[in-house]
Amino acid sequence: MIREKVTVSTRTLQWKCVESRTDSKRLYYGRFILSPLMKGQADTIGIAMRRALLGEIEGTCITRVKSEKAPHEYSTIAGIQESVHEILMNLKEIVLRSNLYGTCDASICVKGPGCVTAEDIILPPSVEIVDNTQHIAWLTEPIDFCIGLQIERNRGYILKTHHNFEDGSYPIDAVFMPVRNANHSIHSYGNGNEKQEILFLEIWTNGSLTPKEALHEASRNLIDLFIPFLHMEEENLHLEDGEHTIPLSPLSFHDKVAKLRKNKKKLALKSIFIDQLEFPPKIYNCLKKSNISTLLDLLNKSQEDLMKIEHFHIEDVKQILGILEKHFAIDLPKNQF
């Protein structure tokens, strides 16, 4: 366990990890402070950060199991101590860490007797198990235990749908939430108009992320939410007599395209985000992971730069070039492949 003495800066806004410990392979704890803040700022940041930590961070789960030997979810299989339902619940608890995009397949194939644990899961290279000792099933007889698994990376939670059980495929309620809990508290100091605040933030994770990693990802997600407001252009708004409201009329995507074609200002480039460019999910996720969020970011990359992105192929680059040509009649610098 690491614990540091809390020292408060009186000038520059600073954050610091003041306590960090690992209670188990599946329970990490971290405590952070941010100071000095003006009165009211700590609560604003604390509420937003807690919501982002609990709801905006992606996690990886087993979402579906396939077995030809199980007639239904509540059946039992000869030679296995647990029912099918109990095995599904054990698989639901497996904690995974990954840089996966979308879904992938995994499997278990073990011969009894013996204990089946998370260590027996055959995974793709992009996925790893946090705790290999997690129990899945007990095989009491010399039988073959072979099942297929679907693994998915997402956020929030997804409730299983009760259909398509005839092929031996069983969906699992998935909780894509690596942060188990998050709390914030506020300490005030100073007098009168000089009163300031310290924000204390506590984070518990399931081991797939450290609290510091979770804090970084939550902060990045919050920043992404506010970026559009930084790039809004000021427009001349006129009020008629008796009007007390100003209608906001942000540029539509097609307006931005027209403006880009006309003068190609950096401001227009910055205000077009890649989620507006009709990219397939794989391309969009890969670009976001590489910190490419706007059209300006993309145009600053060459074709060779894009080919260096993990999981990217020449077909993906060609698709990006086609979309840029379609909407903007522009191209990325060409390289020889």
Swiss-Prot record:
| EC number annotated for this UniProt entry | 2.7.7.6
Provide the residue span(s) of the region labelled Alpha N-terminal domain (alpha-NTD): 1-233
Q: Which domain of life is it from?
A: Eukaryota
Subcellular localization is given as: Plastid, Chloroplast
Q: Does the keyword Ion transport apply?
A: no
CDD domains according to UniProt: RNAP_alpha_NTD
Q: State the UniProt keywords alphabetically.
A: Chloroplast, DNA-directed RNA polymerase, Nucleotidyltransferase, Plastid, Transcription, Transferase
| Domain comment quoted from the record | The N-terminal domain is essential for RNAP assembly and basal transcription, whereas the C-terminal domain is involved in interaction with transcriptional regulators and with upstream promoter elements.
Protein name, per record: DNA-directed RNA polymerase subunit alpha
MF (Gene Ontology): DNA binding; DNA-directed RNA polymerase activity; protein dimerization activity
Family in the record = Belongs to the RNA polymerase alpha chain family.
Annotated region (Alpha C-terminal domain (alpha-CTD)) at 266-337
Catalytic reaction equation(s) = RNA(n) + a ribonucleoside 5'-triphosphate = RNA(n+1) + diphosphate
Q: Which Pfam families match?
A: RNA_pol_A_bac, RNA_pol_A_CTD, RNA_pol_L
Query: One GO CC annotation, please?
Result: chloroplast
